[in-house]
Amino acid sequence: MERIWLKNYPPGVPHDVDPNQYSSLTDLMETAFRDHADNPFSVCMERWMTFRELDALSRAMGAWLQDQGLEPGSRVAIMLPNLPQFAVTMCAILRAGYTCVNVNPLYTARELQHQLKDSGATSIVILENFAATLQEVIEQTAIRHVVLASIGDLLGPWHGRWMTFAVRHLAKMVPEFELPLDGGRTVTSFKKVIAQGRQMSLKPTVQTLDNIAFLQYTGGTTGLSKGAVLTHRNIVAAILQAEGWFTPALSSIGDLRKINSIAALPLYHIFALTLCLLAIRQGSHLTLVPNPRDFGKFIEVLKQRPFHMLPGVNTLFNALMQHPMFKTIDFSSLKLTQAGGMAASEGTARHWQSATGSAMIEGWGMSETCAIGTNNPVTQKHFSGNIGLPLPSIEIAIKDDDGQSLPVGSSGEICIRGPNVMTGYYNQPAENAKTFTADGFMRTGDIGIMDTEGFTRIAVSYTHLTLPTKRIV
């Protein structure tokens, strides 16, 4: 198909990306650990972690996981907020040859049970604050190994110990729990896992771009939560697509390793996860915000040092602007405000740009596409109200109910094809048959219109279908 949108790409944005430059996502990680060892990777509550530390910690945890006798490709669940433990755990799982299953820490017992049972996860790394929820359902799942993290595990010996004490005993944010140990089930503290893993060796694993990296759960286009099967190829492609698209906004920084991105969106969310992995590739760093709903503390974090990229959702931007301390934030270094998760309103975007000097750039994507789909050019000077152009190596087609492509300017279902698009829903053959068209496009359930310049907008109303937008980027 003709890619009419390419003519509107900003200078420097590639038309295509090549995931084959890496043999796997873990190859990308190993390269980053080698090339950026002494660079900072993240900061959380003023505790820094370098790439060298991320390498060592994830290597230790990966070795420990292997020592539990897990089969290659086993699913390991992660139920953590934006703490340093998240990246360590994610990298450990992948380096050990397993599959990550991201879990929303605020899930109810019913939601948690469904996801653990559907994925077949045999292990879980969970913050102790949420262990009481796990206790309710663990007997109905295949979980055999529980790694129990505390908030202060990676925040330094003194500050970390104090934070854990404060959360447990002062704020009383850790409900009482008792995880059953029958049937050989193990419960091990995060710190003990790292200590034991340091005495072990991480065994090399043979992984390809076609191995499964993540089961990313989503409502899908309809029905119950489903696991989108995201391969190493899908994730590597998404990283390269995001990097290519964002570069025009960030290139003025010079050394991309100096980029400071604010990670306020939860890392179990596919867009934040992709940006975390982009930071690993680039050697840049993340400022982790464990609880962005505490806007006072969030603003204090934003005031601590210059930041260059701020992804968020409409409600987050609105709440920030309404806070009395908002005007004390220095936005002079902000190069990119990336909006998604829900439709950004023109009023919010106009107010944000007036207050910060940064245009709000809106995009669209899904868990099924690694959060990558369309995005407005990052060189855009003002909010557009549409969802932008397809990113490198992505094709967007507007199709009718029979899967036939419609002429430019017609309203129909937005369908997407590209190396970042999932291979299907986990153990859902009937759903997969309905989700993909004969020519390999994925039906998104969103209704839109593409204009002659290649820009797409979500249709406000459509007479044949009434479906919620899956916009998440």
PLM regions and their residue ranges:
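Conserved AMP-binding/adenylate-forming core of the ANL superfamily
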Residues: 20-21, 38-83, 87-91, 108-113
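Conserved ATP-binding/catalytic segment of the ANL
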Residues: 23, 389, 404-409, 413-465
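Conserved structural elements of the adenylate-forming
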Residues: 55-60, 193-200, 228-253, 317-318
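Structural core segment of the AMP-binding/adenylate-forming
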Residues: 67-68, 95-192
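Gly/Ser/Thr-rich phosphate-binding loop
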Residues: 162, 304-312, 321-382, 395
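Conserved pre-ATP/AMP-binding loop-to-beta segment of ANL
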Residues: 174, 178-217, 224, 249-260
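Conserved small/polar residues in nucleotide/adenosyl-binding loops
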Residues: 218, 463-469
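Conserved AMP-binding/adenylation subdomain of ANL enzymes
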Residues: 236-260, 268-308, 323
